[in-house]
Amino acid sequence: MSEMLFFVITTIVKAVVILAVMASLAGLATYAERKVLAYMQRRVGPDMVGPAGVLQIVADMIKLFTKEDIVPANANKFIFLIAPLISAIAAFAALAPVPFLPEFEVFGHTIRPILADINVGVLYIAGVAAVCVFSPLAAGLASYNKFALISAARAVVALLSFEVVAGMALLSVVMVTSSLSLVDINNYQKGIFNWLIFKQPLAFVLFVMASFVECNRTPFCLTENETEIVAGYGTEYSGMRWAMFFIGEYTNMIAASIIITLLFLGGFNEFLFIPGALMIILKSSLVFFFFLWTRASWPHLRVDQLSMLCWKILLPLGILNVVITGFALLI
């Protein structure tokens, strides 16, 4: 088998595997969130379908597949129908330059668990994250619903504000590692004292907060605040189109957990006797748990509080961090 043919086959296989695994994990994440929140609130959570309620995911999937797909009479049908697709596609597209595991060999061929090892992976992820704003915006505008429209406006304010903060955090990482490749950034962090969480703690905090906004999670969950705007931009959606928004949201959470691990927590480098593959799974799981923990612990912020936090506090801190990093590299 020629190298080119092997490359094409492995790329197709990797794309299918990544899509299947991430879609399955997104479903499992909904179950994990419900159980974690139930435990923290002294409830039982899902427990009726299957052992410990684990088959609740299958029951929910069957329910959503069999629900009627309703389009409001006054909605812009084309935009209304493609908005959920934008959410899911953008979430999966962000995974292309992410190295999930260390490389390994199969029949003498080296397999790299990454779909596209591009040398501008960080820039690519920032670009795809910027595209995510079009999904709630399109859904809110096309739904012809006041709650959806307010939610869309909130989404634009939140996402555009924190894109700048995330950019400042990523710029600090790139300055330290001298690379835009996630593989190079991972390789830079060999040894626990080289983890960028210790060299760039402020950038870590800024990027985590920006990830919460990107994933629409508490305390920055302004677009789906049930007590104010019902279900936000998804109010008029039903069935699998409604589910696609949440597949995109939970895929974003999983992707953000992996990216945070690669950028700041040593990635898949080995630690003591723990192999690299297990390390990235453990660290990403802890970051994902942190997403769930905050939902059970923190209240929502108002829109004006979010904007003030971003533009008056976090952005100046991000710029200051970049300046200090630049001076430190020159010395």
Curated annotation (Swiss-Prot):
- Tell me the Gene Ontology biological-process terms attached to this UniProt entry: aerobic respiration
Pfam families in alphabetical order: NADHdh
The protein's UniProt keywords, in alphabetical order, are: Cell inner membrane, Cell membrane, Membrane, NAD, Quinone, Translocase, Transmembrane, Transmembrane helix, Ubiquinone
Query: Which gene is transcribed and translated to give this protein?
Result: nuoH
Native organism is: Campylobacter concisus (strain 13826)
> Main localization of the protein?
membrane
Its name, as the record gives it, is: NADH-quinone oxidoreductase subunit H
Top enzyme class = translocase
Please give, as recorded in its UniProt entry, the membrane topology of this protein: Multi-pass membrane protein
